[in-house]
């Protein structure tokens, strides 16, 4: 809808490639929400990579229910990058962190995606018109979840231990290709 070039951060992160990236003036970072913030691997990568040509940045975060006070940390990241912070927007999408939460069934997932369309249109309109996103909710709960809970949640809860192979594995290797941390490998095609 915005007709702009895309950069696959997963490929860059997986390859540990923090070389400079030629960008347009406007950068739109679309990322999942991990524990009420952007994933640490994404913020770490952004902290190291130079965005040549970038002047403004919008953060678009998909989430299962909420992004907490991620905007505070995104604003700080933008300041460190010397970019004009244009806001943080959330798009509620089907839960996909299956190690901890249940994914919705197909019908419920379709309904969640359909319900997200007005938010997506609003986000596109803001970016297209060079406008800041409206400030997201920021209450005590949001600040607590993104602040005190995030580091504990990431250290104690967000682990790969819950991901194991089963007889359903067909040995296609897709999980190996997609894992940005390179911590999945096939052993005897499983």
Report the location of each language-model feature.
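FMN-binding flavodoxin-like domain, especially the glycine-rich phosphate-binding loop
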Residues: 1-12, 19, 23-31, 35-152, ...
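Generic structural motif recognizing short loop/turn segments at the entrances and edges of beta-strands
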Residues: 2-3, 159-161, 189
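Charge-patterned, long linear interaction tracts outside catalytic cores
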Residues: 149-173
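Iron-sulfur cluster-binding cysteine motifs and their immediate structural context
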Residues: 164-165, 170, 174-190
